Amino acid sequence: MYLYSFDRFFGVDKVCLLGDTGKKKIKPGDLLVFGNQYFLAIGETLVFSEQYQHLETVKPELVYKEFMTKSTLDLFHWMVETYYTTYKSVVRLFITNAIEKLLEREGKLKAQGSKLKAVVQSWGFSLSVEWQTLIVFPDLWTMFNSTSEDFRESEGVAFLSATQTEKQKDVHRWEIKKWLKSVIICTYAEIFQDFHDLKKIIFVDPHKRYYASQQDPRYKVGEVLEKMRELYWAELEIIWLYY
């Protein structure tokens, strides 16, 4: 089993091997700890495995079952292969290295009431009533001109922005993973979440291209959303806005 280390100074591309754990069965997606270092089990195989011939072996303890879903792990591997990049570059798009703080914030979540009723009534487009919907905007200007403040602040909606604090982002990660939020609205940089069960993706104005200085990986948003549609068996809808 290959592991990904959240320690910023760990080894080649922060990848290592899982040592003997006795009778404890470790599965891909599990979170483990060794000393003060956290590791994510990412699977029995790696993309570009020839680059990982001499890896360190560690024997960590299990700390969180199913910390990441299979669909998210599959997206990790696909992005590494498709964009010829590293696991380090891909994983950081999804999750912070401050795992202890992330785990602490899970226990502070507040239970939500009815998630969808008010949201569906206030939104003109078709949402997934039973599962999660991701709505992706090219920029905040388009988002704010296409949605009302009441909608963005609805109980069942997670509004994600690159301007939010790390604490806010961590809380949203848990809310999305645990299905406390049914509708996720965001710009391109925030699409990388560990969804509970994503069944609808709405891609708004895809003709607006995304650029980022020194961006790695240099992913194409449309390609990533299409792969997410495939992995989650979700519907992908493209919306064109005319002002």
Q: Where are each of the predicted segments found?
A:
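Accessory, non-ATPase domains that flank or precede helicase/AAA+ motor cores in DNA-metabolism machines
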Residues: 1-242
